[in-house]
């Protein structure tokens, strides 16, 4: 059986990870998750993509919202609102317990990897979810007027300001998770997550970037674009604002130095020749995942 490493963001990546979890032995699956979205809020360390993956794989996610836990209550947030506290980032009561426990574990001296694995055990999951790095890397969104932290852009401002660039802070002190030996994986999968803010933070980490470049024949990309639109999140909007065509060809060009195989949706079959010309082995299937 092959060993797979998934490079994963939030909702779209989590759906693919769930498919792998349900299809192969957990011993053959590792999921490295973007932590560029992580931030400290109300004194708590919050890891949105790690939590989305963990909740999804534990069948605990709120599928109607695409984030948070199912059967959630909001007593803390309601009480905080009455105190005129910060409520722009919505924390449900059960979700809050995750952030409290993570923060406690990290403050007790655990690495983010160890804290993540402790949380996985609480959700009866194998220890196959890893943060991309144990060092902090923070994604910022450059707009025309100012630089925004990712959560300020994504949640507080609802992705409204036009994007001009991306900035990743902390790269001088960070690298890909040292607990993951890239040479042990037969295939690396780039999940259908936002290439700019979910996958690109990982590609900035030298250990991973160099490995993908040298072993691109072992790397498969799953397109997050289907029929000229993104199924989740602001990927298509960002492409347009950056002056890029919203297409699988743009995705292929973005990953061209790191991947030699790509899966595209059957609605994009007309793009196959252009992807072949870029050097890709193209696979066509139905990419929309319902879970």
Residue locations for each model-derived region?
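Active-site glycine-rich loop that binds ribose-phosphate moieties when present
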Residues: 164-182
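C-terminal functional extensions of proteins
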Residues: 232-291
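Short internal beta-strands
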Residues: 30-34, 217-225, 261-266
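Redox- and metal-dependent alpha/beta enzyme cores, enriched for Fe-S-associated oxidoreductases
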Residues: 203-242
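Short Gly/Thr/Asp-enriched flexible loops that form oxyanion-binding sites at enzyme active sites
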Residues: 17-21, 198-211
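Extreme N-terminal starter segment of soluble prokaryotic enzymes
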Residues: 1-5
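A short helix->loop->beta-strand "cap" motif at the edges of active sites that frequently abuts
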Residues: 25-27, 214-219, 280
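Electropositive, gly/pro-rich neighborhoods at or near active sites that engage anionic ligands
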Residues: 33-170
